[in-house]
Structure formats: structure tokens, C-alpha cells
Amino acid sequence: MKKNKANKNTSGNIAQNKKARHDYFLEDKFEAGLELQGWEIKSIRAGKVNITDAYIIIQNAEAYLVGCRISPLNQASTHVVAAPERARKLLLKKREIDRLMGARDRQGYSIVATSMYWKKCWVKLEIHLAKGKHAHDKRDTLKDKDWQRQKERMMKHSV
């Protein structure tokens, strides 16, 4: 018989970076795998991950996730030194890395992490090419959101 593992979070989103949608115009989307250690997987299953300030750097034709915090569990292995904010290598194809590098260097884009999720048994990271917003752009998007809410409210009450 198959045992149910109710405490494991193996479906859907692990973490989201909602701040990225507010601070950047998100354009091209990529899916990347992560090179993780055993204690990091255990912490991710427990939900102890934060990607709010995460971004991607490219060095020596390899992409790394920087600013992602994975807090170690208390039961984690004692013989491994846990570094919660270490740079984690992203698993991308060569042409994807080349495209990211070109856009970052020539057009002034940033590369930000927007979502971390499970895909089957693998942890995947959704990254976007992004262009920074100015203060007036942020205000405009907030005004548009408020207007959309008001329209929905008016339509709901008028019916």
C-alpha cells in the first residue's frame, strides 16, 4: 500500500516575488532549474524560503541566483555548514544564457526571480527579463488597479 505524505508541499508555488511586478516591467519569461543541496530541499519543503530580493547574475557564462534566502531547519545535518544566502547555480541552456546576457548588456535590462515552484519532483525558478519602473510608472499602475477595482465594485452593485 502507498503511504500518504500529508506534510510535504510538492504541488504548486513555493514562493513568489510580488515586489518584482511592482518595481519592474516584466517582459521575457524563462524557466530554470536550481542546483541545490539536501538541507535546502528539506527547508524548501518546510516553506522556509524567501525570494523577495532575489536577482540573477551571470559570471563566466553561468547564471547564479543571488539574494534568495533559504533558512536551514533545526534538524539539518550538523556536519554541513548551512549558508542561507549563498549564490545558487541556475540550470539554463547555453542559448538562454546568451540571450539573457545580451539583453542585460545592450538594452539595460535586469534579470529578476519572480516565482519558485515544484515541477514534478524538481524545484524550478521562473525568471524574467525586466526593465525598472520610475516612480511615476508605479503611481500610474496603482491608479489603474484602483480604477479597475472601482469599476468591478460599481458593476457588482449595479446588477
From Swiss-Prot:
<keyword id="KW-0694">RNA-binding</keyword>
<dbReference type="GO" id="GO:0005829">
    <property type="term" value="C:cytosol"/>
</dbReference>
<comment type="function">
    <text>Required for rescue of stalled ribosomes mediated by trans-translation. Binds to transfer-messenger RNA (tmRNA), required for stable association of tmRNA with ribosomes. tmRNA and SmpB together mimic tRNA shape, replacing the anticodon stem-loop with SmpB. tmRNA is encoded by the ssrA gene; the 2 termini fold to resemble tRNA(Ala) and it encodes a 'tag peptide', a short internal open reading frame. During trans-translation Ala-aminoacylated tmRNA acts like a tRNA, entering the A-site of stalled ribosomes, displacing the stalled mRNA.</text>
</comment>
<keyword id="KW-0963">Cytoplasm</keyword>
<protein>
    <recommendedName>
        <fullName>SsrA-binding protein</fullName>
    </recommendedName>
</protein>
<dbReference type="InterPro" id="IPR023620">
    <property type="entry name" value="SmpB"/>
</dbReference>
<dbReference type="GO" id="GO:0070929">
    <property type="term" value="P:trans-translation"/>
</dbReference>
<comment type="similarity">
    <text>Belongs to the SmpB family.</text>
</comment>
<dbReference type="Pfam" id="PF01668">
    <property type="entry name" value="SmpB"/>
</dbReference>
<feature type="region of interest" description="Disordered">
    <location>
        <begin position="138"/>
        <end position="159"/>
    </location>
</feature>
<dbReference type="InterPro" id="IPR020081">
    <property type="entry name" value="SsrA-bd_prot_CS"/>
</dbReference>
<dbReference type="GO" id="GO:0003723">
    <property type="term" value="F:RNA binding"/>
</dbReference>
<dbReference type="InterPro" id="IPR000037">
    <property type="entry name" value="SsrA-bd_prot"/>
</dbReference>
